From Swiss-Prot:
Residues 243-263 have a biased composition (Polar residues). The gene is ODAM. Glycans are attached at residues 115, 119, 244, 249-251, 255-256, 261, 263, 273, 275. Residues 243-279 are annotated as: Disordered. Pfam families: ODAM (PF15424). This is Odontogenic ameloblast-associated protein. ODAM protein is the unique constituent of calcifying epithelial odontogenic tumors (CEOTs), also known as Pindborg tumors. CEOTs are benign but locally aggressive pathologic entities arising mainly in the mandible and commonly associated with an unerupted or embedded tooth. They are characterized by the presence of squamous-cell proliferation, calcification, and, notably, amyloid deposits.
Length: 279
């Protein structure tokens, strides 16, 4: 019995890992996670506070970095061991950063190779071509628009339209009316003496009215178109003028200054005064 018990203790002590070995339970879990390369998992970031207890595994880290990022083969094993001992969680991040820098450097190199052909033709070759191309175009535009700005409208010859002989004298008289007569302003014309004892009626400059019939120098009567009074004041001025002007009546001119309504009363009052005076 004693021998069996001693053999049991001996086997237990031999099987127990008294010295830290490279293959531990954590390493076995890392190896299982490293087999899932397609998922691109980061096993060192999943361990949390146990990172300080994990010794650096150069072989496993090399396989891990090569599996995730193939561009890290340039790093040596000693550098990986140092990074694993100091910051094991940030190793893939530094690798990705270095790979990104390498990718950027790879992108910059073709640009640097392409830029020298672009910078070879200096500005001395470009500027004369630009000036020689733009200057004649600008000069052509200047000569093209030069007559437009210099020729003034009143200097251009006016186009005279020949009048047709079928126009009546009334239409010709309407054409000879000045433009300011259309807005109600008619100047007061002089009254020339006309043979035959007739005189031309003067226009009224205040109301802007004209007589119905204007006598021409030839003696023919032509109806004047402007028969209505024209209000040439502003509507908001507060002055109202009738639209139709009454016909000029000359009856009161030739009548006596004494009112006719008072004249019948004068004999009656005279009779009353005479009857009162009689005894």
């Amino acid at each position: 019995m004693k021998i069996i018990i001693l053999l049991g203790f001996l086997g237990a002590t031999l099987s127990a890992p008294l010295i830290p070995q490279r293959l531990m339970s954590a390493s076995n879990s890392n190896e299982l996670l490293l087999n899932l390369n397609n998922g691109q998992l980061l096993p060192l970031q999943l361990q949390g506070p146990l990172n300080s207890w994990i010794p650096p595994f150069s072989g496993i880290l090399q396989q891990q970095q090569q599996a995730q990022i193939p561009g890290l083969s340039q790093f040596s094993l000693s550098a990986l061991d140092q990074f694993a001992g100091l910051l094991p969680n940030q190793i893939p991040l530094t690798g990705e950063a270095s790979f990104a820098q390498g990718a950027q450097a790879g992108q910059v190199d073709p640009l640097q190779l392409q830029t020298p052909p672009q910078t070879q033709p200096g500005p001395s070759h470009v500027m004369p071509y630009v000036f020689s191309f733009k200057m004649p175009q600008e000069q052509g535009q200047m000569f093209q628009y030069y007559p437009v700005y210099m020729v003034l409208p009143w200097e251009q010859p006016q186009q005279t339209v020949p009048r047709s002989p079928q126009q009546t004298r009334q239409q010709q008289y309407e054409e000879q009316i000045p433009f300011y007569a259309q807005f109600g302003y008619i100047p007061q014309l002089a009254e020339p003496a006309i043979s035959g004892g007739q005189q031309q009626l003067a226009f009224d400059p205040q109301l802007g009215t004209a007589p119905e019939i204007a006598v021409m120098s030839t003696g023919e009567e032509i109806p004047y178109l402007q028969k209505e009074a024209i209000n040439f004041r502003h509507d908001s001025a507060g002055v109202f003028m009738p639209s139709t002007s009454p016909k000029p009546s000359t009856t009161n001119v030739f009548t006596s200054a004494v009112d006719q309504t008072i004249t019948p009363e004068l004999p009656e009052e005279k009779d009353k005064t005479d009857s009162l005076r009689e005894p």
